[in-house]
Amino acid sequence: EQRPAPLVRTLERLVPRLAWLYGYDKVPKGLVDRFAWAELAGPQGPVATEEVIIGLVLFAPGCTYPSHAHTGITESYFVLSGSVSQNDDGVFTPGSMLFNPPGRRHRITVGQRDPALLAYAWVGARDELAGQKLSFRKPRK
């Protein structure tokens, strides 16, 4: 049995009660209908806090979440199911952790067979967490 399987079974009861979102103001064409996310704790989550954002993200098989970075935010992922690659740096399976310090560009690619469910945590200053906007544009040189 996979290490996070008991956690996934526990989350199954919570998932229908979450407010799942299916995009942002501007979603890259290849990402439409390929992912959803729900905040568990944070400014928009059922557990209200301005100190951290914790949530779940579900990716469709074969989905590529474009390269992006978070200004002033440290982001960690915990793979709950499926398999993903970050920046083509190997394959991460259930139980794997991924860590992105502030400003590090990263791209998530999901395996072709199964969807991937990841838990994520964002840590940063309150103003950074509250004002975070995702941009999929490459920084100008």
Residue ranges and their predicted role:
Residues 33-44, 52-71, 102-105:
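Conserved short histidine dyad/triad with adjacent acidic residue
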Residues 54, 74, 95, 115-116:
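Structural motif
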Residues 49, 76, 87-107:
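Short acidic-glycine-tyrosine-enriched beta hairpin
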Residues 111-141:
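Double-stranded beta-helix
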Residues 56-62, 69-85, 122:
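Short, conserved beta-strand element in jelly-roll/cupin
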